[in-house]
């Protein structure tokens, strides 16, 4: 069951604001290449582990979260500096002005734990041939 946010703000087209929660599950997790590349230790304040609803697929060099039943392990942060988001969107191949080019979409979803809304990147292309990560944890693939 894909959990919709408590209040929808047009899904991926809304602006990320300072104070918003952001959940990550792959290369943007602490210790991974994307986290360091964008200086997220300054832009994002860590809030701890989180669980998201969905399925996680190994897409080669990175994972993709797709809608569906299951749990995905991630980390939740509070956004301190939203000016980093256009660069992070580009890294995630999310183009808000040109969705047809996008591999991911940034959406606000309801987390399983903690029980709150958070932004997350959701894979929007097919997963044919990709391996399901049964544990739901990119670090335990």
Each model region followed by its residue ranges:
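Glycine-aromatic micro-motifs
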Residues: 2-5, 9, 13-141
């Amino acid at each position: 069951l894909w959990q919709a946010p408590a209040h929808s703000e047009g899904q991926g087209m809304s602006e990320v604001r300072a104070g918003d929660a952001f959940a990550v599950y792959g290369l943007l997790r602490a210790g991974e290449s994307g986290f360091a590349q964008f200086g997220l230790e300054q832009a994002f304040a860590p809030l701890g582990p989180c669980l998201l609803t969905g399925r996680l697929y190994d897409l080669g060099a990175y994972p993709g979260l797709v809608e569906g039943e299951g749990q995905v392990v991630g980390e939740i942060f509070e956004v301190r500096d939203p000016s980093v988001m256009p660069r992070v969107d580009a890294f995630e191949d999310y183009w808000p002005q040109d969705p047809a080019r996008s591999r991911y979409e940034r959406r606000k979803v309801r987390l399983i734990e903690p029980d709150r809304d958070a932004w997350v990147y959701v894979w929007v292309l097919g997963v044919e041939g990709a391996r399901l990560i049964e544990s739901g944890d990119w670090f335990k693939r």
